[in-house]
A protein has these predicted regions:
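Membrane-embedded alpha-helical bundles that constitute the cytochrome b-like, heme-associated redox core
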Residues: 1-194
Length: 194
């Protein structure tokens, strides 16, 4: 398998970015639900799970930036769109995903930086990822509305990704089982394309 994308399929780097980011996002959605809905305020586990959530989010951000750079340097294989409508829907959903995989962690980072608690991110226990310096010196009263605005934005974007994910998976399965083309195989390692 080629490292770079070819006319027929994605290369190993693009596949790795796709699947690693997808798994990290799914893990982070689950962690986000867990600490937001099921862990009581004041429970020390809430802080720990929140740190994992933030660490994964920052990892998604870094990997997504690298993925966008890689995509700009390696054009993707041309998809076999059977209709102009499918072409348009595919392009909109892919650009929406690229926007979301960047915007969700960015809004999370800004939200964390504007938190009245002032905690940085303990990046997987290796080091503290610093907050944005723009919020330093602000009082809790000044930070609270900023934090809440970014938190709301973060949650709305996360829900948008949750809604878009089954559409993306459904479209890949539709291509594979209904149209019987190679769209899904192009992103799966170890598959052959006719």
């Amino acid at each position: 398998m080629s490292v770079r994308n070819t006319y027929l399929r994605y290369g190993s780097v693009a596949m790795a970015f796709h699947w690693v980011i997808a798994l990290l996002i799914i893990a982070n959605v689950l962690l986000g639900f867990w600490f937001a809905e099921f862990i009581e305020r004041g429970d020390p586990m809430k802080f720990t799970v929140a740190q994992w959530h933030k660490s994964i989010g920052l990892s998604v951000l870094v990997l997504s930036i690298l993925r966008v750079v890689w995509r700009l340097m390696n054009p993707h294989p041309p998809p076999p769109w059977p209709t102009p409508l499918m072409r348009g829907l595919s392009m909109v959903s892919h650009y929406a995903f690229y926007f979301l995989i960047l915007a969700i962690p960015i809004t999370g980072y800004v939200m964390t930086s504007a938190s009245p608690l002032g905690n940085g991110t303990d990046y997987f226990g290796f080091f503290t990822w610093p907050n944005l310096p723009i919020f330093q010196g602000m009082t809790r009263a000044q930070l609270r509305p900023i934090h809440e605005t970014w938190e709301t934005t973060h949650v709305v974007l996360a829900w948008s990704a949750i809604v878009l994910l089954p559409v993306h998976v459904g479209a890949a399965l539709y291509h594979h089982f209904r149209l019987r083309d190679d769209v899904l195989k192009r992103m799966l390692p170890g598959t052959t394309i006719a």
